[in-house]
């Protein structure tokens, strides 16, 4: 918000030792996910359960009695933290001592953050006993809101993931309220890093005609498809295929960043129902398949094939289609327009003429709006385009050695995007009316500085409100316990250009918070304000759209001189376990009001 005074906070749980600094760092950088170790929604689904041994299971010889008494049943665990601890301990116990990685937080020294999401942060780290660098994903289990059974099953399934094109899982353990997942760290970064360095090496003028050549693209995509084939044959969906999640090792190995748990926790037993896949709306949906956006009938592994098609465009042009637009506009463009092509990013005719028919055919087939018409990973590997692919040595030469002198480009927490407004169409549906997209990232450093200033503003305290004070919102009038006007508000009339508002919503600790902010018509957008609330962790990421829509409703009421001063609405994030939605107490609901 350009001129808003955002106030409010959420209670945070302090972690010990290195995790404390890590958690603080992640909270300050939770706006978007652009790093190579993306932490929003990665792999979902499970392996075929026939190949997995469940925790605490018993075994007998066929046709005979067991040779030894069966082990006692596993202890009953009643929280995600206890479940994660039990599952992780069971996995470690199955390993030979020589293969075991340390499972104490003190054995690792966390370094820089390389990926930030709504419920987790990925760090580079140093394993002291093994004298080895690793990647550690720190997942806040309280925010995951997953069941005990899901957590136990998915940690075990993740440990069984073993493929040369998937990042290796080492171990996992509990550190305070967090689950730490230790994985291999690939030291050459992601394909997003490579794209940025390539653009810097050849210059923006040359890069506008294509960033990577077809041979490099074919080699990279072939390895990605091998990893996806492995996922899909084992009943998994990755859901976050993009350049930032495709990693490169110094020997030319391509691996998919599979940080498992935050994505695995989003579904259970292959259940791809609407309720289980809501989490896909975290982050910019440039790579998201239409059926995932619609959230009507669920989706299957063909969603990854769509993302692969977007990845192909990204590797060629340097960016995904619609990357300059706000998330809501990306949703609209993807759903309403024809599928993107290589020319979607073009600004002139024949801009990408260097790319041939076989490459464009691959993109076209991947980006079929009907999932049934998209080929499988196994079928794609037979496409003629991949005959152009080379071996790992080629990638070492073209993507590592040739770019060795180019400095690594720092990741910004988010790109500058176009502004716009939510408007209601003739049928009463909400649509995003955008201004013009940004043409350059040259101001990104200034943007980051401005963002830091806004984050400091957002650290102002929120006032805790009693449950009884939430009554009255259902009628649409001012609630009897509605937040009081700011001091001095009765003496002066605020500028008509600016509206003072307050959002009353429960935090993760289920306490009612009043989050005060202002809306300036000439400077703010409702989508931008909602995004800032998510960034400051004042509202759940799943509530971004619904908060923006109701904020626009209230603004419309104010502009029409309506007497209505408050709106109560249901939240997409729902309620916690053992809670019942209650509009009166704002359990599963929120209330937005105008201040006098």
Swiss-Prot record:
Q: Low complexity compositional bias: what residue ranges?
A: 1-54
Q: Which GO terms describe its biological process?
A: cell differentiation; cellular hyperosmotic response; epithelial tube morphogenesis; hyperosmotic response; intracellular signal transduction; meiotic cell cycle; multicellular organismal-level water homeostasis; positive regulation of gene expression
Q: Which residues form the Protein kinase domain?
A: 108-386
PTM annotation, UniProt: Phosphorylated at Thr-280 and Ser-419 probably by wnk-1; phosphorylation results in weak activation. Predominantly autophosphorylated at Thr-32 and Ser-190 and weakly autophosphorylated at Thr-13 and Ser-405 in vitro.
The record places the active site at: 240 (proton acceptor)
- Compositionally biased region (Gly residues): 466-479
User: What GO cellular component is one of the record's annotations?
Assistant: cytoplasm
Q: Phenotype of the disruptant?
A: Hermaphrodites arrest after the first molt and die after at most 6 days. Most animals appear L2-like with morphologies of gonads and vulva that are out of step with the developmental stage. Mutants have a dilated intestinal lumen with extensive internal folding associated with the accumulation of undigested bacteria and a shortened excretory canal. Some animals have adult-type alae and are sterile with vulva and germ line formation defects. In RNAi-mediated knockdown, impaired survival and slower volume recovery upon hypertonic stress.
Query: Which ranges are annotated Pro residues under compositional bias?
Result: 67-77
Q: Where does ATP bind?
A: 114-122, 137
> How changing residue 137 to R/M affects the protein?
Loss of activity
Residues recorded with modification Phosphoserine: 190, 405, 419
Q: Which residues carry this modification: Phosphothreonine?
A: 13, 32, 280
Per the record, which residues fall in region Disordered? 1-80, 429-496
Catalytic activity, EC: 2.7.11.1
Write out the annotated subcellular location. Answer: Cytoplasm; Nucleus
- How is expression of this protein distributed across tissues? Ubiquitously expressed with a higher expression in the excretory cell. Expressed in both male and female germ cells; up-regulated in maturing spermatocytes but absent in mature sperm.
Per the record's keyword annotation, is Nucleus included, yes or no?
yes
Keyword Iron included in the entry's annotation:
no
Which Pfam families does this entry report, sorted A to Z? OSR1_C, Pkinase
The residue ranges flagged as biased composition, category Acidic residues, are 432-450
Per the record, the similarity remark reads: Belongs to the protein kinase superfamily. STE Ser/Thr protein kinase family. STE20 subfamily.
Name this protein carries in UniProt: Germinal center kinase 3
Recorded source organism is Caenorhabditis elegans
Gene responsible for this protein: gck-3
